[in-house]
Amino acid sequence: MAAEQRVHGHQAAGDGPGLDAKVSFLSRPETYRPAPAAVACRETHMSWVFLAGDRVYKLKKPVRFPYLDFSTLARRERACRAELALNRRLAPQVYRDVVPLVQSHGRLSLGGEGTVVDWLVCMERLDERFMLDRLIANGRLTAAQVARLVDALVRFYRMAEPALIAPTVYRAELLRSLDYNRRVLLDGRFSLPSGLVWRIDHAQRRFLRQCGGLIDARFRYRRVVDGHGDLRPEHICLDDDVRIIDCLEFNARLRVVDPFDEVAFLSLECERLGAAWAGELLRRRLMRELRDGPTDMLFTFYRCYRATLRARLAVAHLYEPHPSTPEKWPRVAREYLALAARSARKLEAFLKTPSSR
């Protein structure tokens, strides 16, 4: 897509005002129609999110990382449109539109006449009381809600497109990820327990050497799909409906998953938040409904790998020039490493028992 294009009859050229000016404009209640009483702003390493009344607007930062590129206006527009389309698979009523931020005679506006200087995803604002992480924290999650979540996931995974990459490529990428996880987690600046990191890493590599065929079989039977890619409790709303938001739109390869890999990740997060029962119920019900689940050993590998990845992502915040709450991330990484170690011990036991494979 060219950087310059006609959009709603208006010329979209350069990015115009800087990010700070855009954020300042989008932080004001009078920017929106109708104007909310206040606008709450949240920053991530990829986006700014503006909560304005019953709507949420997401502005992508002009950043480039190894796994994504939002550095140009055209790339951000493509990412916004991909986010809309992909997330409508699991939350069709939440994702409303892609909205242009325009400039005319030096003034910014959402939509209207002018030169497009950026793009935003407009979403329905969900009731945070019903997000899965809040339900767990408040002791309000029920087995019936978990059952409804499983039903939604079953429908999604049955409709999801099978992955188009070869299992050998997938396993090679897994090994590269293990290398990266180990390298970051052994960085002496983070003071993480190196012996534990090595033990976890060894168990995962031994599994891939001895039992990688279990992953190949999931590809052979077309069980690996274009999934969500970031199935966390804070992305799941369980009010009158089940809405799952914030899939990984920016990198299709990161959405190539075994459904039970995603559920292993979600069960891990539920356990970390104090609801291990919910994660186990998710696994059991999904196994029953899809009728094609992996072995216990493969599910344990998925949990071990995801916990290690989350540990690495936690301390990776400290590579940023000005990380927020720097004291938090090593503690979070240790929590994930403890979960990974538990799964690694189970993997070691499985690997000693050929019949468990």
Give the location of each predicted region:
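Intrinsic structural disorder
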Residues: M1, L26, A37, S355-R357
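Extended hydrophobic/Leu-rich segments
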Residues: M1, V99, L347-L351
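Conserved ATP-binding subdomain of kinase catalytic cores across diverse folds
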Residues: D20-Y221, D226-H228, P233-L309
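Intrinsic-disorder-associated interaction segments
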Residues: A12-L19, R171-L174, D201, P326, ...
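A composition/secondary-structure signal for short, hydrophobic, low-basic-content segments
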Residues: M1-E4, I200
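ATP/Mg2+ or Mg2+-diphosphate-binding catalytic cores
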Residues: R312-S356
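Intrinsic disorder/low-complexity segments enriched in polar/small residues
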Residues: Q5-R6, A12, C270, A349, ...
